[in-house]
């Protein structure tokens, strides 16, 4: 997989979506705003990605202090300045969600079941962890308190450490 090509294509897609945004019908814009309201994660995700790009893809715990914590005055002001870039990220997610819905509906119409069967943990350097630190086993500086993995078994005599934070269950 060529990440550079994927990044370039994603940037081009984002610019095309933004260029077409002003000519969208009011109904389409309303649908987008409803989608954003129903998917509260997208605000944090889009903000996170734009900040990450601002700092050359550094992980969030290496960002300047004022960017590490969501919902501070500085960050709110910065978000307003970057509103167009953040909109692009949200438009891309909306576009992808629309495509995924088409795929799901096609599969369902053919009685094809889509399943996922992988252990799932969130990356430490993700919008989810950055914006919801209290839900994960991490220190304030981003270091892991506990990390996911599996003990030794048939597949690995030494076990595995995956380097992703575990969920912080109270």
What residue ranges belong to the model's regions?
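Structural preference for beta-strand elements that scaffold enzyme active sites
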Residues: 111-115
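Conserved, mostly hydrophobic/aromatic
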Residues: 48, 107, 117
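Alpha-amylase-like alpha-glycosidases and glucanotransferases acting on alpha-linked glucans and related
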Residues: 1-94, 122-170
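Active-site neighborhood of glycoside hydrolase catalytic domains
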Residues: 92, 96-109
């Amino acid at each position: 997989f060529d990440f550079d090509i994927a990044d370039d294509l994603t940037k081009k897609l984002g610019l095309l979506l933004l260029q077409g945004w002003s000519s969208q019908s009011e109904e389409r814009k309303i649908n987008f705003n409803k989608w954003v309201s129903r998917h509260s994660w997208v605000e944090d995700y889009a903000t996170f990605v734009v900040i990450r790009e601002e700092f050359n893809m550094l992980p969030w715990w290496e960002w300047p202090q004022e960017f590490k914590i969501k919902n501070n005055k500085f960050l709110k002001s910065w978000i307003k300045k970057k509103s167009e870039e953040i909109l692009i990220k949200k438009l891309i997610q909306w576009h992808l969600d629309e495509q995924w819905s088409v795929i799901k509906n096609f599969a369902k119409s053919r009685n094809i079941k889509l399943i996922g069967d992988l252990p799932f943990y969130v990356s430490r350097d993700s919008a989810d962890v950055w914006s919801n630190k209290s839900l994960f086993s991490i220190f304030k500086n981003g270091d892991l308190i506990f990390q996911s993995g599996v003990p030794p078994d048939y597949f690995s005599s030494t076990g595995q450490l995956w380097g992703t934070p575990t969920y912080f269950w109270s």
